[in-house]
UniProtKB/Swiss-Prot annotation:
PANTHER family: UDP-3-O-ACYLGLUCOSAMINE N-ACYLTRANSFERASE (PTHR43378), UDP-3-O-ACYLGLUCOSAMINE N-ACYLTRANSFERASE 1, MITOCHONDRIAL-RELATED (PTHR43378:SF2). It comes from Rhodopseudomonas palustris (strain TIE-1). Belongs to the transferase hexapeptide repeat family. LpxD subfamily. The lineage of its organism: Bacteria, Pseudomonadati, Pseudomonadota, Alphaproteobacteria, Hyphomicrobiales. Homotrimer. This is UDP-3-O-acylglucosamine N-acyltransferase. The gene is lpxD. Keywords: Acyltransferase, Lipid A biosynthesis, Lipid biosynthesis, Lipid metabolism, Repeat, Transferase. One of its GO terms (biological process) is lipid A biosynthetic process.
Length: 360
């Protein structure tokens, strides 16, 4: 359940209010004034908690729950114990999240809670930097020359915003992050330790490996979220671009000249080599590695821990090392398993050889 010490909730709500906010139906109106003070999973919930159910895997937890109310679809409504108020919703988890966003709005942004709104006395801000009203700069952050920061943006403790960087409105730049050679849109969230705009990995690999100047930028469009420890290299000649609405998990490495489309989802520890392109709505599972100059089409999906060396057409699902269409991958894995099982059966049928003869 949510920790109220870290995430103080709003005042409690009645089930009638929750039904209105989530567009759910309160099945028994006699529960309309029952108050909910927090959220919890079915197995941890008490009489003042709201929970949800939409997966039969958790049937035992539902049967034994002490929750005060449960969001559930009409299909599973009859499984809810009689002492639990039923909120009927077409998509229970979506309704649960809608109320969670209302109750714990502070949890939606990577605030550290260090310092008060405004400019901390220990922050260092260059005289040529331009900050709109209602910008917060936390302790020990450094803002360089000619930086521009939009209203409502928070620069976390110890962050460094290098010369010429432009940051839009209502952004959160996590503690310890470092931004250079970058243009950042509105409502961009960066969790702690992001590094944006450093050199791309560009060398002439011969003899002493001659470094290639990296003179491009990083452009991050509106509504992008970057997980902790994510790094995005600036382009060499053209820009590295992260498209609007894309969500990137922790510890992802994005190489120089990469173009990522809109509303992509990239899970933790992916590595994207230079000059590749992701279309819109692409999904990458955790620890996917993609070769340089590859094109991943709109809506394509890549399974976790895959290695991609070839371009993937739009809308296809690929996986494996090296990645290929998932149906092909599954057939190959099944064939290998059958081959291994057959080989194991033959080995087990052979008489013991004499390699261990004489050992005690």
């Amino acid at each position: 359940m949510a920790s109220t010490s870290f995430f103080p909730p709003r005042p409690s709500s009645t089930l009638a209010e929750i039904a209105s906010l989530t567009k759910a139906t309160l099945v028994d109106a006699s529960y309309a004034e029952h108050r909910i003070t927090g959220l919890a999973s079915l197995d941890e919930a008490g009489p003042m908690h709201l929970s949800f159910f939409e997966n039969l895997r958790y049937s035992d937890e539902l049967a034994n729950t002490r929750a005060g109310a449960c969001l559930v679809s009409e299909r599973f409504e009859g499984r809810v114990p009689s002492h639990v108020a039923v909120l009927r919703a077409r998509r229970p988890f979506h309704a649960f999240v809608a109320y969670a966003r209302h109750l714990y709005s502070d949890a939606l942004r990577p605030h550290t809670g260090i310092g008060a709104p405004g400019i901390a006395p220990t922050a260092v801000i260059h005289e040529t930097a331009k900050l709109e009203d209602e910008v917060t700069v936390e302790p020990l952050a450094v803002i360089g020359p000619d930086v521009e920061i939009g209203s409502g943006t928070v620069i976390g403790a110890g962050a460094v915003i290098a010369a010429g960087v432009k940051i839009g409105r209502d952004c959160d730049i996590g503690a310890g992050s470092h931004l250079q050679h970058a243009l950042i849109g509105n409502n961009v969230l960066m969790h702690p330790g992001c590094h944006i705009g450093q050199d791309g990995f560009g060398f002439i690999f011969a003899g002493q490996h001659t470094k290639v100047p990296q003179t491009g930028r990083v452009i991050i469009q509106h509504d992008v979220e970057l997980g902790a420890g994510t790094t995005i290299d600036r382009g060499s000649l053209r820009d590295t671009v992260i498209g609007e609405g894309t969500k990137i998990d922790n510890q992802v490495q994005i190489g120089h000249n990469v173009t990522i489309g809109r509303h992509c989802v990239i899970a933790a520890k992916c590595g994207l080599a230079g000059s590749l392109t992701l279309g819109d709505n692409v999904a990458l599972g955790a620890m996917v590695g993609i070769n340089n100059h590859v094109m991943i089409g709109d809506g394509a999906q890549v399974a976790a821990m895959s290695g991609v060396k070839d371009s993937i057409p739009a809308g296809e699902r690929w996986g494996g090392i090296f990645a290929r269409p998932t149906r092909t991958w599954f057939r190959e894995m099944l064939a290998v398993r059958r081959l291994a099982e057959g080989s194991g059966a033959e080995t087990a049928a052979r008489p013991d050889d004499d390699r261990d003869e004489g050992r005690g």
